[in-house]
């Protein structure tokens, strides 16, 4: 069955009234879509609207689509009503497997087999979420970074029953909707960005627990150090450029032994030739032939 034409897609269903659901709704409204928002409890509506109203000035500053309007928001506590006419569904319900499984079971009974449903889950696996869904082939993870209306990353990965064309479609849709989708190679708990964030978070907690640094020390160290650099080049490219000519190969060959130094409470992987070559080749591909002088200037 053919999936919706992305270029003419106009209506999106957003499920969930929390910060993620509200943030997604704000983003889609700013991009000029009609948004049909499902709230489990009507009492959630004031807080949900407040999230969007808080986000809107930022979105105005960033630039709204010509057709963007808060008037294009429709709120309901009827699930079937929410998904009626929607060509894409972004699910941001409570982060509990049993509740998500129940929700996807219901969606499988009322949503067409040509509609992709993406979950904002930050840690659950789609293979588990889709277990009881009749249209599991169209279900996948579309995990944003919070707030979704400001941070462009969306991690996209399917479950055991998800079809490749559903993932292809989701990648194209998120691009169309102004996001920066990252297609994961395989389904892993926590995906990519959250696992990296969690490693940093655990190390920070260790330093505070051992009275080695205060929370303020840690945040200042990041804000005025690696965080600024990583925003420009990312972790891998920053280390690729750091050693000048020779790049990642020189970095790993020179500093590889430092992986065994007690600089972290996390175990370092073994620096095998395969790992070394994967890092070197990956950074060379990202560099795209640019000189180290040019990359350093950036």
Which residues make up each language-model segment?
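Active-site-proximal catalytic alpha-helix in oxidoreductases
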Residues: 23, 148-157, 176-177, 182-212, ...
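NAD(P)-dependent Rossmann-like dehydrogenase/reductase catalytic/cofactor-binding core
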Residues: 2-7, 31-33, 179, 210, ...
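Rossmann-like NAD(P)-binding element
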Residues: 43, 58-116
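Hydrophobic/aromatic beta-strand patches that form the interior of the parallel beta-sheet core
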Residues: 36-38, 76, 90, 140-142, ...
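Rossmann-fold dinucleotide-binding core
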Residues: 119-186, 190, 194
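ATP-dependent carboxylate/acyl-activation modules
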Residues: 2-5, 14, 19, 24-31, ...
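NAD(P)+-binding Rossmann beta1-loop-alpha1 motif at the extreme N-terminus of oxidoreductases
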Residues: 1-62
């Amino acid at each position: 069955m053919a999936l919706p034409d992305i270029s003419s897609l106009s209506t999106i269903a957003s499920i969930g009234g929390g910060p993620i659901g509200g943030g997604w709704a704000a983003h889609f409204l700013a991009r000029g879509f009609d948004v049909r928002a499902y709230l489990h409890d009507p009492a959630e509506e004031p807080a949900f609207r407040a999230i969007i109203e808080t986000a809107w000035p930022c979105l105005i500053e960033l630039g709204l689509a010509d057709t963007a309007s808060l008037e294009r928001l429709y709120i309901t506590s009827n699930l079937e009503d929410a998904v009626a006419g929607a060509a894409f569904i972004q699910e941001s319900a409570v982060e509990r497997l049993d509740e998500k499984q129940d929700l996807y079971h219901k969606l499988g009974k009322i949503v067409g087999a040509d509609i992709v449903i993406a979950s904002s889950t930050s840690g659950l696996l789609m293979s588990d979420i889709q277990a009881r869904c009749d249209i599991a082939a169209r279900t996948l993870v579309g995990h944003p970074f919070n707030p979704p209306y400001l941070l462009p990353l969306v991690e996209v990965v399917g479950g055991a029953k998800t079809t490749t064309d559903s993932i292809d479609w989701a990648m194209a849709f998120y691009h169309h909707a102004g996001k920066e989708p990252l297609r994961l190679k395989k389904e892993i708990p926590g995906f990519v960005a959250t696992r990296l964030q969690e490693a940093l978070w655990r190390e920070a907690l260790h330093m505070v627990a051992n009275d080695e640094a205060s929370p303020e020390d840690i945040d200042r160290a990041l804000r005025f150090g690696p965080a600024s650099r990583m925003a420009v080049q990312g972790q891998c490219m920053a280390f690729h450029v750091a050693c000048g000519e020779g790049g990642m190969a020189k970095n790993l060959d020179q500093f590889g032994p430092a992986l065994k130094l007690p600089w972290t409470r996390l175990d370092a992987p073994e620096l095998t030739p395969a790992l070394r070559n994967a890092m070197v080749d990956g950074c060379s591909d990202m560099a795209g032939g640019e000189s180290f002088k040019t990359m350093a200037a950036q």
